Amino acid sequence: MSRIVEPPTQRQGARRVWSDSRGRIWVAEWNSGNLSMHDPALGMGANSWRTWKAPGADPHVYAVYVDDQDIVWAAEWSNNAMLRFDPGSEKFAVIPMPRPAANIRQILGRPGEVWLPESGTEFISVIKTG
């Protein structure tokens, strides 16, 4: 059986989702420039969602990944950067990409590493986290 989970931000343009160790679902929102989190343990209503505006001018968040330490990583296209979001402090760190127009569409990793395939440059970047 499937069900509809409706984010509270109108026309948010969800692109990618990832879950953390607590079962929360993190959502990259392209149109709104938000990083959102849905906690199914809180039900399906608006109070089960939290939203943070990505830093930078006119942000567009495309991909999201949660690492083994529950740090949330997001690809932000308008400012050609990776965002490191700490859910505990609710703070973003901005990591500029080394090449213009990296256009990261998916993020993966393994313990201590975040892998970033750059569709705009045909390179793969790796951020060491450990």
For the regions a protein language model found, what residue spans apply to each?
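A short loop-to-beta-strand structural motif that recurs across blades of beta-propeller domains
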Residues: 34-37, 81-83, 123-125
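Ankyrin-repeat and related helical/solenoid repeat scaffolds used for protein-protein interactions
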Residues: 65-114
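Short loop/turn segments that connect beta-strands within beta-propeller blades
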Residues: 39-44, 86-90, 128-130
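Conserved beta-strand positions in repeat-built beta-propeller and related beta-rich domains
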Residues: 25-31, 72-78, 116-120
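Long terminal segments
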Residues: 107, 117-120, 124-129
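Beta-rich, blade/repeat-based domains predominating
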Residues: 8-24, 56-69, 100-112, 121
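A short beta-strand motif characteristic of beta-propeller blades
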Residues: 2-7, 48-54, 91-96
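Intrinsically disordered, low-complexity linker/propeptide segments enriched in Ser/Thr/Gly/Pro
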Residues: 1-7, 26, 35, 39-41, ...
